[in-house]
């Protein structure tokens, strides 16, 4: 009888210790972004959150907050330092507010195409720039997702740079995003991403710029007449882990987070490429006019009017990116 009691007590203690350990070990994390639930950036984030839970045996419970639920893009970047979010997806243009050199990728016509961008993410110059960001902020860029080539949508036809003169255009309040529109004479307005559709609809602005996939997902095509293939920025998003969380992760968990997030970014990148290829025909079917432009003319205008130093970029970094094959 005593032996049985001892066995039962030992088993109960072991179960209690296991339950306590599991309870103490599980961390609840917040992952935030500004994109719609239908977009690959969200679906891949949800997959990654679930996969991290599986691979860590439930030590992490990650909730994903899409569509600016935890704030605009500037807010969630600030949230990494405030501790209100643990993981975000965000462009290097926002990272550049803390470490300007990393924003050089947004200088218009830096990348030839998506493959050039993806090759850059495996280069030494990428490692140097992301390390500079981490040294400045403590936050760790763990993965990069292709966002798409940024083009212009407008209610005014645009065939040459000068056609943009006086155009009321929504552009994010990011110096490099502003470079091409301002070089061509547009009047820019920094309207929040969540408010762009209404601003286009009510005429507050006549135009905006984004990848084709975003123009489709946010339904901007419903309130625009023209798609102009300016192709001025080959854009990307960073998956960033807060410095506070990164410090707490064991080496084993760092590897799991990194592997899963890079797998997720590869999934989203693949989807974006496929979707992007279909959208020119989609917009034509919706009755929009799609216009090709001479990119050399636009690029030359930007280079003549916009210095790297004015953005606190380093031309040496840009030259290194140009050399990436």
What are these regions (language model features)?
Residues 9-18:
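Bacterial N-terminal signal peptides
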Residues 17-25:
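Sec/Tat signal peptide C-region and signal peptidase I cleavage site
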């Amino acid at each position: 009888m005593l032996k049985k009691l001892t066995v039962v007590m030992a088993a109960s203690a072991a179960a209690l210790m296991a339950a306590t350990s599991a309870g103490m070990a599980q961390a609840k994390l917040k992952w935030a972004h500004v994109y719609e639930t239908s977009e690959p950036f969200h679906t891949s984030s949800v997959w990654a959150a679930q996969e991290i839970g599986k691979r860590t045996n439930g030590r992490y419970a990650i909730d994903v907050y899409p569509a600016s639920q935890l704030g605009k893009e500037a807010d969630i970047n600030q949230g990494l330092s405030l501790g209100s979010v643990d993981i975000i997806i965000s462009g290097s243009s926002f990272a550049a507010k803390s470490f300007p050199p990393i924003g050089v990728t947004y200088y218009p016509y830096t990348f030839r195409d998506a493959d050039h961008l993806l090759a850059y993410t495996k280069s030494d110059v990428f490692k140097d720039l992301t390390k500079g960001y981490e040294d400045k902020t403590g936050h760790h860029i763990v993965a990069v997702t292709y966002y798409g080539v940024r083009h212009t949508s407008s209610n005014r036809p645009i065939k040459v740079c000068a056609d943009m003169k006086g155009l009321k255009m929504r552009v994010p309040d990011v110096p490099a995003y502003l470079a091409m529109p301002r070089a061509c004479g547009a009047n820019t307005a920094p309207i929040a991403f969540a408010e762009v559709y209404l601003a286009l609809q009510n005429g507050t602005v006549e135009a905006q710029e984004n990848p084709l996939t975003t123009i489709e997902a946010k339904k901007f095509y419903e309130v625009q007449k023209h798609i102009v293939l300016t192709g001025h920025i080959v854009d990307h998003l960073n998956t960033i882990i807060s410095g506070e969380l990164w410090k707490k992760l064991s080496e084993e968990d760092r590897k799991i987070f990194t592997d899963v997030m890079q797998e997720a970014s590869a999934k989203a990148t693949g989807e974006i490429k496929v979707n992007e290829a279909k959208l020119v025909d989609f917009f034509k079917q919706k009755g929009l006019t799609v216009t090709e432009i001479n990119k050399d003319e636009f690029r030359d205008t930007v280079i003549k009017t916009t210095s790297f130093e004015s953005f606190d970029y380093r031309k040496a970094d840009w030259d290194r990116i140009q050399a990436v094959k």
